Regions:
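C-terminal catalytic "cap/lid" subdomain
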Residues: 1-217
């Protein structure tokens, strides 16, 4: 196939039975990453409407600057913490084969974009700030504080039942504090734990994350 250019669609896949279906949010980028992994590409390029990954959301912080290079781990952490340029699952196929990903702007071809790779020369410190909106905080204090192992198992079972995963979960002598992206299934989770303990809820929060290397040093 040398010298040939193949064009295919993203976002479309198939079930185990071969029935065509969509693959979910950001699956066009994911499709490119999977194909890149399959052919062991030298680079995977994702073309979008921004110059790359920025030090902050440029729609919120006008002084934000684009990042020329960052590691897979940093990009994965940023995506997980709310950065919109790449979905976390897009990075995984590239990481398996150590294939660099370059984010390019289809409206600004003069920009070389952001290169995501395994190793870069970088000083310690923050690389970028990510924001995840519509976060809910749940403070849960169980009525029966004597049997935490069973309580922990029950809570984990509810996470699995409603297909939710906390952004953060901290336990202390008073109970457990959860942070979740506020999706409808979280409300069912709250309803169930309210039957076995007292809950305090704060909504319309944002989770702000600093991503980088040895930030506290």
């Amino acid at each position: 196939y040398e010298g040939k250019i193949f064009i295919t669609q993203g976002f479309i896949g198939a079930t185990e039975n071969g029935v065509p279906t969509t693959m979910g949010r950001e699956s066009s980028d994911f499709s490119a990453a999977v194909i890149g992994e399959a052919i062991n590409a030298s680079e995977i390029q994702i073309w979008t409407d921004v110059d790359g990954i920025f030090t902050a959301d440029p729609r919120v912080i006008s002084q934000a600057k684009y990042i020329a290079e960052l590691t897979f781990e940093e990009a994965l952490e940023l995506a997980d913490k709310g950065a919109k340029v790449l979905h976390p699952k897009t990075m995984l196929p590239a990481m398996e084969r150590n294939i660099p990903i370059r984010i390019r702007n289809s409206k600004n071809k003069k920009s070389s974009g952001s290169l995501i790779t395994s190793e870069i020369k970088q000083q310690n410190g923050a690389v970028s700030i990510a924001q995840k909106k519509d976060v809910i905080l749940i403070r849960f204090s169980p009525f029966d504080k004597k049997n935490y192992p069973l309580l922990s198992e029950h809570i984990s079972g509810l996470h699995a039942k409603y297909c939710i995963s906390p952004l953060s979960q901290i336990s202390d002598e008073r109970g457990i504090t959860f942070l979740f992206q506020h999706i409808p299934s979280v409300d069912f989770f709250i309803r169930e734990i309210s039957e076995i303990g007292q809950t305090e809820i704060q909504t319309n929060l944002s989770l702000i994350s600093l991503v980088g290397r040895n930030i506290l040093q």
